[in-house]
Swiss-Prot record:
The gene is Dap3. It is found in: Mitochondrion. GO terms for biological process: apoptotic mitochondrial changes; mitochondrial translation. It comes from Mus musculus. It catalyses: GTP + H2O = GDP + phosphate + H(+). It is an enzyme of class 3 (hydrolase). Residues 45-59 have a biased composition (Basic and acidic residues). Its EC number is 3.6.5.-. It holds the Pfam family DAP3. Residues 1-17 form a transit peptide. The keyword Phosphoprotein does not apply. This is Small ribosomal subunit protein mS29.
Length: 391
């Protein structure tokens, strides 16, 4: 019976959602459908995440476009960015799990080891945007942001792979490293002249960064000498971790798709054998940053099925996506479940799409249309967005 239900649901998903928003015969025979009372989309004017509380749950807040450029220079999920471009604004919903996370971050004890917060949930529930809500909070309150927007990009489809000059057992990814350095500089430029490196770093026979030099010189080395970009990333992470307890800055380590650090890669050596994640210099250094053996900040991680390699599409629990090695490496952590929309959140999202004329079908704004969208999407944020986009 379960198999039959599963097949039925999969067929429903494949149908054109417009066919469900039908014009019934009875409706055409009756008088004109009475217009529904106007509703105002649930919004808050507070664009500062620090001011968000339980009273804002389910409301949308606007990320200033300037913040979008500096805090998220790499962009946000593609379909979300399509909405930003279409609507001319970047709005995030204030959700209960994000409020829980913000509460923890507001009360961070910087004298204690960094706490690891792990966002998990089924596919499409909004883990990435909840993580971005936390990143925006920290950026607005002068934290130094070390953000990896998609760790899976480091373990597959690498554009260039070189043997490490620092360690012959590992491999460098200069293009991925230089891209990350560019975005890191955009977000944290005000810190790069203040933080001084604690060691001398030799890049080649002619170039070196002297002890006491601004950290920005290391970043520039990676940007101007792309071959050194991977080593530059390693130096940046090492220096930030070593200096985080000095009180010069508060450090947020945010990694989306952290399960990629302990999964399998698609990258191959010259003998055609697969490269293990720990053989990649970027992964090796990032694993050090998600350890809780440093002070002066917090670690916010998310699990992701999107882009995950060789994992079941239905897997979403930490032990399923991290595996034994990854789970043991991150334990202890504080898990935060990101669920599907509750009724209030669904209604807020639905009204937001209506307000922005994202729903063009004539029956979409009716109670019948609302119920069918709720049924088809199962209140899953990603599925709701995809259904609404096709209407």
């Amino acid at each position: 019976m379960l198999t039959g239900i599963t097949r039925l649901f999969s067929r429903v998903q494949k149908l054109d959602p417009r066919c469900f928003l039908h014009m019934s015969v009875q409706a055409t025979q009756n008088s004109q459908v009475p217009a529904e009372r106007p509703r105002t989309v649930s919004r808050t004017s507070d664009s500062d995440p620090a001011k968000h509380g339980e009273q804002h749950e389910g409301q949308h807040y606007s990320i200033p476009l300037q913040d979008l450029k500096t805090v998220f220079p790499h962009g946000l999920p593609p379909r979300y960015m399509m909405q930003v471009k279409t609507f001319g604004e970047a709005c995030l919903m204030v959700r209960k799990p994000a409020l829980e996370l913000l509460g923890y971050l507001k009360n961070t004890n910087f004298a204690h080891p960094a706490v690891r917060y792990l966002l998990y949930g089924e596919k499409g529930t909004g883990k990435t945007l909840s993580l971005c809500h936390a990143v925006h909070f920290c950026a607005r309150h002068d934290w130094l942001i070390l953000h990896i927007p998609d760790a899976h990009l480091w373990v597959k489809n690498c554009r260039e792979l070189l043997q490490s000059t620092h360690n012959k057992q590992r491999f460098d990814q200069p293009l991925e490293a230089s891209t990350w350095l560019k975005n890191f500089k955009t977000t944290n430029e005000r810190f790069l002249s203040q933080i001084k490196v604690q060691e001398k770093y030799v890049w080649n026979k002619r170039e070196s960064t002297e002890k006491g030099s601004p950290l920005g010189e290391v970043v520039e080395q990676g940007l101007t000498r792309v071959r050194n970009a991977t080593d530059a990333v390693g130096v940046v992470l090492k220096e930030l971790k070593a200096q985080s307890a000095l009180g010069l800055f508060h450090l947020l380590v945010a990694v989306d798709g952290v399960n990629a650090l302990w999964g399998r890669t698609t990258l191959k050596k010259e003998d055609r054998t697969l490269i293990a994640p720990e053989e990649l210099s970027l992964v090796h250094n990032l694993r050090k940053m998600v350890k809780n053996d440093w002070h002066g900040g917090a670690i916010v991680l998310s699990l992701s099925q999107t882009g995950s390699l060789f994992k079941s599409r239905t897997a979403y629990l930490p032990h399923e996506l991290l595996g034994k090695e990854g789970f043991n490496a991150l334990e202890p952590f504080l898990p935060i479940l990101i669920p599907n929309y509750n009724p209030k959140e669904f209604e807020s999202s639905f009204q937001y799409y209506l307000e922005n004329n994202w729903l063009q079908h004539e029956k979409a704004s009716t109670e019948e249309g609302r119920k069918e969208l709720r049924f088809l999407s199962n209140c899953n944020p990603e599925q709701l967005e995809r259904l609404c986009a096709s209407l």
